[in-house]
Swiss-Prot record:
Residues spanning the signal sequence: none
Catalytic activity: 1-(2-carboxyphenylamino)-1-deoxy-D-ribulose 5-phosphate + H(+) = (1S,2R)-1-C-(indol-3-yl)glycerol 3-phosphate + CO2 + H2O
Record keyword Chloroplast present: no
Name by which UniProt lists this protein: Indole-3-glycerol phosphate synthase
Keyword Amino-acid biosynthesis attributed: yes
Gene name as annotated: trpC
Species: Cupriavidus taiwanensis (strain DSM 17343 / BCRC 17206 / CCUG 44338 / CIP 107171 / LMG 19424 / R1) (Ralstonia taiwanensis (strain LMG 19424))
Listed transmembrane segments: none
Gene3D superfamilies to which the protein is assigned, alphabetical: Aldolase class I
GO terms for biological process, alphabetical: L-tryptophan biosynthetic process
Pfam families: IGPS (PF00218)
UniProtKB keywords: Amino-acid biosynthesis, Aromatic amino acid biosynthesis, Decarboxylase, Lyase, Tryptophan biosynthesis
Domain of life (superkingdom): Bacteria
Length: 267
């Protein structure tokens, strides 16, 4: 595990401990469970939105709303989650990914609520999930999907977090980087498999990472390639390899109009 990932996980543990003091788990769980059928807050179907785009012959883009990153600093000074979400929806995104980590990515729970409230797209809570508390938290904030990072979790906890999310009606995107992590990910139930092209130890990016892992991924998995999609040629390279789902953040966040950049990249 990289030093930066260890630091992030230590901060997450402290955040969860503090959150539990502000609100107990039974109360949070009760609210999360009550939202299964509440108008406007019920899960929107993250996996279904991706598959519908692909079935229609389009790239399924998970468009990210991210103000900053540990490696690149602030990506977008004029940061209005509602406007960004609306722009993405208008220009063909399938889903949203919203950073909620405050310490390292300058994200916030409120950004998720505001972005999801501004458009009809399903939303992923993009964060480092290490505790059941965060899963219930995600649902009360309106998340339709959570991210599980294999490099950050042992299998027992990962399976527990997945089961909780599925029970609440959310989808789960499990993220891997290498062969060893892929083996663990394939033991989960979720069909959504994200391949991060960024090495979490060196922060170097290579699209070859997705292509190298593809032969080892069962056909029933929906592969999402993450990081490093910067040009139409990158999109073509992936789609030629039968990868049709993409999670893109930085390229959009640095553009004057994120949705227009989405349309340019995937048009």
């Amino acid at each position: 595990m990289s030093d930066i990932l260890q630091k992030i996980l230590a901060v997450k543990a402290d955040e969860v401990a503090a959150a539990r003091k502000r609100r107990d788990l039974p109360s949070l769980r009760a609210e999360a469970e009550s939202l299964r059928s509440e108008a406007g807050l019920a899960p929107r179907g993250f996996e279904r939105a991706l598959r519908d785009k692909i079935a229609a012959g389009h790239a399924a883009v998970i468009a990210e709303i991210k103000k900053a990153s540990p490696s690149k600093g602030v990506l977008r000074e004029q940061f209005l989650p509602e406007a960004i979400a609306e722009s993405y929806a208008t220009h063909g995104a399938a889903c949203l990914s919203v950073l909620t980590d405050e310490h390292f990515f300058q994200g916030h729970a409120d950004y998720l609520k505001r972005a999801r409230g501004a458009c009809p797209l399903p939303a992923l809570r993009k964060d480092f999930m290490v505790d059941l508390y965060q899963v219930y938290e995600a649902r009360t904030w309106g998340a339709d999907c959570i991210l599980l990072i294999v490099a950050a979790l042992d299998h027992g906890l990962m399976a527990e977090l997945e089961a909780c999310a599925l029970e609440l009606g959310m989808d789960v995107l499990v993220e891997v980087h290498g062969d060893d992590e892929l083996e663990a990910a394939l033991r989960l139930k979720t069909p959504l498999l994200g391949v991060n092209n960024r090495n979490l130890r060196t922060f170097e990016v290579s699209l070859d990472n997705t292509l190298d892992l593809l032969p080892h991924i069962p056909a029933d998995k929906l592969v999402v390639t993450e990081s490093g999609i910067l040009a139409p040629a990158d999109v073509k390279r992936m789609r030629d390899a039968n990868v049709h789902a993409f999670l893109v953040g930085e390229a959009f966040m640095r553009a004057k109009e994120p949705g227009v950049e989405l349309a340019r990249l995937f048009g």
